């Protein structure tokens, strides 16, 4: 329905957006390159939680690129604010932000995507849209303004979606460390009685029942890459960036 908030499985709404990298047409800019993209909104530039998020996204930028995924931010701030904030982050924290940020001072884009906070029409919530190479929305995530995102989980989601697409499998909870089937991927269930019976008799898959079968078609590299995201999210940083930046500034 035109004007309604988009849903998972729908094509991302067509729009032209102004960013600090210039005007970008969504989703065609990425679809024409055969790329997925992650659009994520933040409440405001020059705020602490948002700064920590952008540093985290930037430090994982190459991980997203290896997956064939581009990043694009969004807030109701101006292009000039985005530019100065990026400069501040690089100068004071030592991290360059390589991806564009949409400037949406009127809230037009945020309103179209359902990203405005119920109690503040001037701030976007921490939303995430994961959009595939066809321009179809595959995942939508919403976080409150006071909680920063776990960027390694967003990487894991993208990795799992792309792997599931290529192998025609569904991905279980906590993959690749699921407590029932480990790194296994779930085989789509049969749709007829004959198929269900044949599946149980064939022994092709490991099964708890005809509707719950799995195998392990993912490569070791794919599994270990996903585990690396989880390990990094759980590990304590060897050194805090603010300490490095403070040393550099002084």
UniProtKB/Swiss-Prot annotation:
Binding annotation for substrate: 126
InterPro entries: AhpC/TSA, Peroxiredoxin, Peroxiredoxin_AhpC-typ, Peroxiredoxin_C, Peroxiredoxin_TDXH, PRX_1cys, Thioredoxin-like_sf, Thioredoxin_domain
EC supergroup of this enzyme: oxidoreductase
Keyword set, alphabetical order: Antioxidant, Cytoplasm, Disulfide bond, Oxidoreductase, Peroxidase, Redox-active center
Bridged cysteine pairs (disulfide): 207-213
PROSITE patterns: THIOREDOXIN_2
UniProt cross-references to Gene3D superfamilies, sorted A to Z: Antioxidant, Horf6, Chain A, domain2, Glutaredoxin
Sequence ranges assigned to domain Thioredoxin in this UniProt record: 6-163
Effect of residue 50 to S: Abolishes enzyme activity
GO cellular component, one term: cytosol
Induction (UniProt): Up-regulated by hydrogen peroxide (at protein level).
Keyword Methyltransferase: no
Alphabetical list of SUPFAM superfamilies matching this protein: Thioredoxin-like (SSF52833)
Subcellular location: Cytoplasm
Reaction(s) catalysed (UniProt annotation): a hydroperoxide + [thioredoxin]-dithiol = an alcohol + [thioredoxin]-disulfide + H2O
Entry's Gene Ontology molecular function annotations: antioxidant activity; identical protein binding; peroxiredoxin activity; thioredoxin peroxidase activity
Active site: residue positions: 50
Functional summary from the UniProt entry: Thiol-specific peroxidase that catalyzes the reduction of hydrogen peroxide and organic hydroperoxides to water and alcohols, respectively. Plays a role in cell protection against oxidative stress by detoxifying peroxides.
Note: The active site is a conserved redox-active cysteine residue, the peroxidatic cysteine (C(P)), which makes the nucleophilic attack on the peroxide substrate. The peroxide oxidizes the C(P)-SH to cysteine sulfenic acid (C(P)-SOH), which then reacts with another cysteine residue, the resolving cysteine (C(R)), to form a disulfide bridge. The disulfide is subsequently reduced by an appropriate electron donor to complete the catalytic cycle.
Subunit and partners: Homodecamer. Pentamer of dimers that assemble into a ring structure.
Similarity comment: Belongs to the peroxiredoxin family. Prx6 subfamily.
Stated name of the protein: Peroxiredoxin
Species, as recorded: Aeropyrum pernix (strain ATCC 700893 / DSM 11879 / JCM 9820 / NBRC 100138 / K1)
């Amino acid at each position: 329905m035109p004007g309604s908030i988009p849903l998972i499985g729908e094509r991302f709404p067509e729009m032209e957006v102004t960013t600090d990298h210039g005007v970008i047409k969504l989703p065609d800019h990425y679809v024409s390159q055969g790329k997925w993209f992650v659009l994520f909104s933040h409440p405001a530039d020059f705020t602490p939680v948002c700064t920590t998020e952008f540093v985290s996204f930037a430090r994982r930028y190459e991980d997203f690129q290896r997956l064939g995924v581009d990043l694009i931010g969004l807030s109701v701030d101006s292009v000039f604010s985005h530019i100065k904030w990026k400069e501040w982050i690089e100068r004071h924290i030592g991290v360059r932000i390589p991806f564009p940020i949409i400037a949406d001072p009127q809230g037009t884009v945020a309103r179209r995507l359902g990203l405005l906070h119920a109690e503040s029409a001037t701030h976007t919530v921490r939303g995430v849209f994961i959009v595939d190479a066809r321009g179809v929305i595959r995942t939508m995530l919403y976080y409150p303004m006071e909680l920063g995102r776990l960027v390694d989980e967003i990487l894991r989601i993208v990795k799992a979606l792309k792997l599931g697409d290529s192998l025609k499998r569904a991905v279980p909870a906590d993959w690749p460390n699921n407590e029932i089937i480990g790194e296994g991927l779930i085989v789509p269930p049969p749709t007829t009685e004959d198929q269900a019976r044949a599946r149980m008799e064939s022994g092709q898959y490991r099964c708890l029942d005809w509707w719950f079968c799995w195998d392990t078609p993912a490569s070791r590299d794919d599994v270990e890459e996903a585990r690396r995201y989880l390990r990094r999210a759980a590990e304590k940083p060897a050194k805090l960036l603010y300490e490095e930046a403070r040393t550099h500034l002084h």
